[in-house]
Design a protein with these regions (language model features):
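Low-complexity, Ser/Thr/Pro/Gly-enriched N-terminal "stalk/linker" regions
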Residues: 1-53, 74-82, 86, 90-99
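Well-ordered alpha-helical scaffold segments within catalytic/enzyme domains
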Residues: 1-10, 59-74, 121-135
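Solvent-exposed loop and edge beta-strand segments that line ligand/cofactor-binding
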Residues: 5, 9, 13, 43-59, ...
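Non-membrane alpha-helical structural segments and their capping/turn regions in soluble enzymes
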Residues: 14, 51-54, 74-81, 113-120, ...
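Aspartate-rich (DDxxD/NDxxD/DxxxD) Mg2+/diphosphate-binding motifs
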Residues: 39, 98-113, 160-169
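Short, flexible active-site-proximal loops enriched in glycine and acidic residues
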Residues: 90-102, 117, 155-161
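Internal, well-ordered domain-core segments that constitute the primary functional module
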Residues: 117-154, 158-162
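Conserved small/polar residues in nucleotide/adenosyl-binding loops
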Residues: 167-177
Length: 178
């Protein structure tokens, strides 16, 4: 590795460990209702009663899982585990499979349609958590979500995937194909 590449790598890692990850750990964890706050204002104020989105939670899960896998810091594992638990316990629809698009600030489903986009991000997060920890539960849920995408989004006639949403095991085609 040449000096410029090494310096850039060190600078990026410093920024990640001293600014980016601490921001999420110190400002966005919701200790009252679980998971993570769903919104922060431009001047850094948490919006305590903002809804919580599946994409944000899944991205936090992936980010802290990958950070733990690479850097092995226990606080990253703790944050990743918090995100995994919240995703499975609150966002996952145990009855009809899939990930709710949005919860209210207390963790109750608000938008119960399952967007394939959210399922994809949940798979990324859960599979990275499994990769970092070997956690079988995360892998099992990632596989379940993959099967839901195959069941509700694959279009064998066009041999591709539709951007669909479903609520109760009924797929509804949206305006575009992936």
């Amino acid at each position: 590795m040449n000096k410029i590449t090494e310096d850039l790598q060190n600078e990026v890692q410093w920024e990640l460990e001293n600014n980016i990850l601490p921001f999420w750990m110190n400002r966005m964890i919701d200790n009252e209702y679980g998971g993570f706050h769903g919104q922060i204002t431009g001047n850094g104020q948490r919006v305590v009663h903002a809804p919580k989105g599946a994409i944000l939670n899944a991205r936090i899960l992936w980010t802290f899982s990958a950070a733990y896998r690479l850097l092995r810091k226990p606080e990253y594992l703790e944050t990743a585990t918090r995100a995994k638990r919240y995703l499975i316990d609150k966002f996952y629809d145990q009855e009809f499979e899939g990930i709710y698009w949005e919860l209210d600030y207390t963790g109750q489903p608000v938008q119960t349609k399952k967007q394939i986009y959210a399922l994809g991000f949940a798979i990324y997060g859960l599979s990275e958590y499994n990769r970092a920890t070997g956690d079988k539960e995360a892998l099992d849920y990632a596989i379940r979500l993959f099967k839901a995408i195959e069941q509700y989004s694959f279009d064998p006639e066009k041999n591709g995937y539709m951007a669909v949403s479903y609520t109760h095991l009924r797929a509804h085609e949206t305006l575009r194909h992936l």
